[in-house]
C-alpha cells in the first residue's frame, strides 16, 4: 500500500514538473509583505505563472503573476535574471526572487530612457568620472558610469544571497531591454483593463 502511494506521489510530482518550466516559492518585495505567511502556510494554494518575455542576450526577463488566496487578485512583478541559473529556481526557502514591482515599472523604464537618451549621448563632463545609481524597492540597482569618453551600465541584484552583476554596455542591448520592459508594462495595463 505504501509503495503504491509513494509511486503515485512520484508520478504526480513528475507530471507537475513536466508542466512547469520555472517555479519560485520564495518571493520578496510587494509579495513578501502581503503574502509571506500565506506562502509558507499554504504553498499549494499559491499559483505561479512565469512567462519568458524575450532573451536580452544573457539576461532573461520574466513576467510573474501571483494569485492571491481568496480574492484571486493578481499581483505583478518583473524578475530579471541571468541565463543558466534556472537550477536555483527550486522550492528551497533560501532562494530569493528579486522583482521590480509593477508600480515601479514606469520609473525603471524612465531610468533606462534617461541612460539611453541623456547619459549615453550627452556626457556633460567627459573628463570627469560620473556615476548614476537608481534603486528599486526590492533592492535591484541600475548603475551607470560615464566619463573619459566611455560609458557602461550594469544591473546589480542577488540570487540565493549571492550578489550578481549583469552588464548592459552597448546601445543595442540597452534598447532591447527597454523594449522588453515596455512590452511588459503594456501587457500589465491590458490585463488590468480586463478586470
Predicted regions: what is each one?
Residues 19-195:
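Positively charged, low-complexity terminal tracts
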Residues 1-22:
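Bacterial Sec-dependent N-terminal signal peptides
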Amino acid at each position: 500500500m505504501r509503495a503504491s502511494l509513494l509511486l503515485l506521489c512520484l508520478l504526480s510530482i513528475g507530471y507537475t514538473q513536466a508542466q512547469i518550466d520555472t517555479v519560485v516559492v520564495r518571493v520578496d518585495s510587494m509579495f513578501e509583505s502581503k503574502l509571506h505567511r500565506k506562502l509558507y502556510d499554504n504553498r499549494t494554494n499559491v499559483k505561479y505563472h512565469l512567462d519568458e518575455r524575450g532573451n536580452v542576450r544573457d539576461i532573461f526577463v520574466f513576467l510573474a503573476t501571483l494569485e492571491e488566496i481568496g480574492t484571486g487578485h493578481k499581483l505583478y512583478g518583473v524578475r530579471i535574471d541571468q541565463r543558466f541559473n534556472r537550477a536555483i529556481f527550486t522550492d528551497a526557502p533560501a532562494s530569493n526572487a528579486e522583482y521590480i514591482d509593477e508600480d515601479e515599472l514606469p520609473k525603471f523604464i524612465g531610468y533606462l530612457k534617461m541612460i539611453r537618451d541623456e547619459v549615453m549621448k550627452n556626457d556633460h563632463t567627459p573628463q570627469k568620472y560620473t556615476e548614476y545609481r537608481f534603486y528599486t524597492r526590492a533592492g535591484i540597482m541600475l548603475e551607470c558610469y560615464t566619463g573619459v569618453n566611455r560609458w557602461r551600465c550594469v544591473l546589480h541584484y542577488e540570487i540565493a544571497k549571492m550578489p550578481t552583476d549583469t552588464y548592459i554596455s552597448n546601445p543595442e542591448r540597452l534598447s532591447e531591454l527597454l523594449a522588453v520592459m515596455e512590452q511588459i508594462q503594456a501587457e500589465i495595463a491590458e490585463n488590468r483593463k480586463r478586470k
